[in-house]
Regions:
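Conserved alpha/beta-domain cores
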Residues: 1-248
Length: 248
């Protein structure tokens, strides 16, 4: 048996090497579980009024330096111990509209190109339909002869430091959290632990549904609660979040 460890909680970030050691010969690698990790970090800091997070889709791995560093550290630990670093999940689901699938493939490729350049060797997908665009950037980079530098293999170059992400805090972001959470709970009550959800349903434009699971429910609930607890002011409406905030 070979196991890949999902790094999806803040305590796990500080124990990555120890977990590989504990599994010994059964350890295959580490996986960067993006949304679960974001949810875990938010849950640990949500009591602090100085750590009120922006809208969740503004908190990307690429533009949030402390998150990037966590995953670069994951890669370094894997490369140091000859384990396989696995990138995040491409959550787009296939559509009957080919135009939507083409746009999803472009987005997936761009995301996986970034991961490949950080030293990740593989990634995973929510649906096999998108396996090829997710795998292509890793194959191309390796076939080019590119190899991770020695600096990329040293975990000490990537210390863990939790900071507040930058981005907009909007009422629209809160509405999207409420909408997504209600859809997820509906699916969960009907026996589905994961569900394809378009958080912008009813809005102009074409986009794929994304596979959402408990991580989405956790971070959506956490953000709604945090904004109400700290009476955060929305940038788009200049309104204060409170228990009377309603979905329009």
């Amino acid at each position: 048996i070979k196991a890949i460890i999902l790094i999806e909680s803040l305590p796990a970030v500080f124990q990555m090497e120890e977990m590989l050691f504990a599994l010994g010969e059964y350890a295959a690698g580490l996986n960067a579980a993006r949304w679960d990790l974001k949810a875990s970090i938010l849950e640990y800091v949500m009591h602090d009024e100085n750590f009120v997070w922006p809208d969740r889709f503004d908190v990307t791995i690429q533009n949030t330096e402390f998150m990037s560093n966590i995953f670069r550290r994951l890669v370094a630990i894997c490369l140091k111990h000859n384990a396989v670093p696995i990138g995040g999940m491409a959550t787009a689901l296939p559509s009957r509209d080919e135009e939507v699938n083409i746009e999803a493939a472009k987005s997936i490729k761009a995301d996986k190109e970034w991961e490949a350049n950080q030293g990740f060797l593989r990634a995973w997908v929510a649906h096999i339909y998108h396996m090829d665009p997710a795998a292509e950037p890793f194959k191309k980079l390796r076939e080019s002869g590119w190899e991770p530098s020695e600096d990329m293999k040293n975990p000490d170059n990537y210390p863990v430091k939790i900071e507040n992400p930058t981005g907009k805090l909007t009422k629209e972001g809160t509405r999207q959290n409420v909408r997504t959470l209600l859809e997820y709970v509906e699916g969960w009550l009907n026996g589905r632990g994961a569900k394809g959800i378009d958080r912008l349903a009813g809005r102009p434009g074409k986009r794929p549904a994304l596979m959402e699971d408990l991580a989405t429910a956790r971070i959506s609930t956490g953000q709604i609660a945090q904004r109400i607890i700290h009476k955060s002011v929305a940038e788009d409406t200049e309104e204060q979040h409170n228990t009377n905030t309603k979905e329009e």
